[in-house]
Amino acid sequence: MGAIRKFPKIVALQSEYCDPLYQARKAGKDDPVSVDVKPTIAEGIAIGKPLRGREILDMMKRHDITVVTAPEDKILAARAAVAREGYYIEHTTAANFAAWDRYCELYGPATDVLITLCGAGIKSDH
């Protein structure tokens, strides 16, 4: 098919309140780091011990996947910003936008960005 000529830059995210993969990448570990999981409004990504964490970290290393955390206080703001554009998303999806914002703070503006909208707002009870 040939639509994509090279492997795209992928940025993974975790909630700042539950970030075992982020902590592992930061420390250069092959296994997820044990973290104290705090309650997060992005409950869909609150996984303290990822079942295939070692495999995920290996994939991140092999494909140079960056991982950033979504600041909890920016998730609600991101959800509101996306709502102003006409999309009703749940908090875990809003974390994608909060993490993208964080990525841009750390690494500069990003162009040609694809952010998935995989959760309708009605899924969340917040």
Predicted features, each with a name:
Residues 2-7, 11-91:
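Active-site/ligand-binding loops adjacent to catalytic centers
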Residues 5, 33-36, 59, 94-126:
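Phosphate-binding loop/pocket of nucleotide- and phosphate-handling active sites
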